[in-house]
Amino acid sequence: MNKALPKAIFLMGPTASGKTNLAIELRKRFPVELISVDSALIYKGMDIGTAKPNAEELLQAPHRLIDILEPTESYSAADFRRDALKEMDDIVAQGKIPLLVGGTMLYYKALLEGLSPLPAADADIRAQIEQEAEQFGWEAMHDQLKSIDPVSAERIHPNDPQRLSRALEVFRISGKTLTELTQIKGDALPYEVHQFAIAPKERAEIHRRIELRFANMMEEGFEAEARALYERDDLHADLPSIRCVGYRQMWDYFDGEGTLDEAVFRGICATRQLAKRQITWLRSWKELTWLDSDDIDGALELISTQLEKK
């Protein structure tokens, strides 16, 4: 008889949907340990603008894979999968259930489905692409991608140079499109995964929460936190850490683009767009149970019922 797979919980959702609060409540009721699934929370010194769980919350529910890198460093979906699997194995060895909580959908996908055999980054080719973009513009580079890989071009916005550059880089290195290569799957996750997504029923409520969160961040000193990063000699606007929503807009403000109020407004708009993309991705997710962030007791009951199923 096959040995039963260990359980794991995915707690997904758009930004500002209440994932952290629900995760803390889950830890009070179930033998779970938390793993952060967030491409911004990995960075040290980026606490306020990422809405990182505060000291009290981390005391109640420690999160693994938070504060593991300097903002100068990069971190891929492959890096996350490697680290998350290690943490999950450690949690299971303690007789507990891994609870993965966050909103970086690409990380969840990589963990659940395995990774496609994409080529490693090539600094020379990346530099060549960036040089072409500087000469012709990212719109022209997007047109180039459209002629090679229309499926990826449909998904990638011309104003997303990181993903656009990567799609072109993959083709130039391998001779195959990103679409072709991502259809080849890696190893599936060896866990019995219970997948949940938490969000308010009304989109307007997400917008309200985002605005409130941004206002709170500014009161807590986000401008000073972002400026401290801006004044470091080892950081620049093209790093993944500084491209995080909120930080990118503050960086532009420090560079002289507009007023502080305008930077805050742009940050709110960018966060709304992020939430919209997260929800769109989740709507296409398979085997997902939706939870109402305005009914935490109901959410806990639903999760409890699912975990008790064999």
UniProtKB/Swiss-Prot annotation:
<comment type="function">
    <text>Catalyzes the transfer of a dimethylallyl group onto the adenine at position 37 in tRNAs that read codons beginning with uridine, leading to the formation of N6-(dimethylallyl)adenosine (i(6)A).</text>
</comment>
<dbReference type="Pfam" id="PF01715">
    <property type="entry name" value="IPPT"/>
</dbReference>
<keyword id="KW-0460">Magnesium</keyword>
<keyword id="KW-0547">Nucleotide-binding</keyword>
<dbReference type="InterPro" id="IPR018022">
    <property type="entry name" value="IPT"/>
</dbReference>
<feature type="binding site">
    <location>
        <begin position="13"/>
        <end position="20"/>
    </location>
    <ligand>
        <name>ATP</name>
    </ligand>
</feature>
<dbReference type="GO" id="GO:0052381">
    <property type="term" value="F:tRNA dimethylallyltransferase activity"/>
</dbReference>
<comment type="subunit">
    <text>Monomer.</text>
</comment>
<feature type="region of interest" description="Interaction with substrate tRNA">
    <location>
        <begin position="162"/>
        <end position="166"/>
    </location>
</feature>
<dbReference type="InterPro" id="IPR027417">
    <property type="entry name" value="P-loop_NTPase"/>
</dbReference>
<dbReference type="InterPro" id="IPR039657">
    <property type="entry name" value="Dimethylallyltransferase"/>
</dbReference>
<feature type="site" description="Interaction with substrate tRNA">
    <location>
        <position position="126"/>
    </location>
</feature>
<comment type="similarity">
    <text>Belongs to the IPP transferase family.</text>
</comment>
<feature type="binding site">
    <location>
        <begin position="15"/>
        <end position="20"/>
    </location>
    <ligand>
        <name>substrate</name>
    </ligand>
</feature>
<keyword id="KW-0808">Transferase</keyword>
<protein>
    <recommendedName>
        <fullName>tRNA dimethylallyltransferase</fullName>
        <ecNumber>2.5.1.75</ecNumber>
    </recommendedName>
</protein>
<feature type="region of interest" description="Interaction with substrate tRNA">
    <location>
        <begin position="276"/>
        <end position="283"/>
    </location>
</feature>
<feature type="site" description="Interaction with substrate tRNA">
    <location>
        <position position="104"/>
    </location>
</feature>
<feature type="region of interest" description="Interaction with substrate tRNA">
    <location>
        <begin position="243"/>
        <end position="248"/>
    </location>
</feature>
<dbReference type="GO" id="GO:0005524">
    <property type="term" value="F:ATP binding"/>
</dbReference>
<dbReference type="GO" id="GO:0006400">
    <property type="term" value="P:tRNA modification"/>
</dbReference>
<keyword id="KW-0819">tRNA processing</keyword>
<keyword id="KW-0067">ATP-binding</keyword>
<feature type="region of interest" description="Interaction with substrate tRNA">
    <location>
        <begin position="38"/>
        <end position="41"/>
    </location>
</feature>
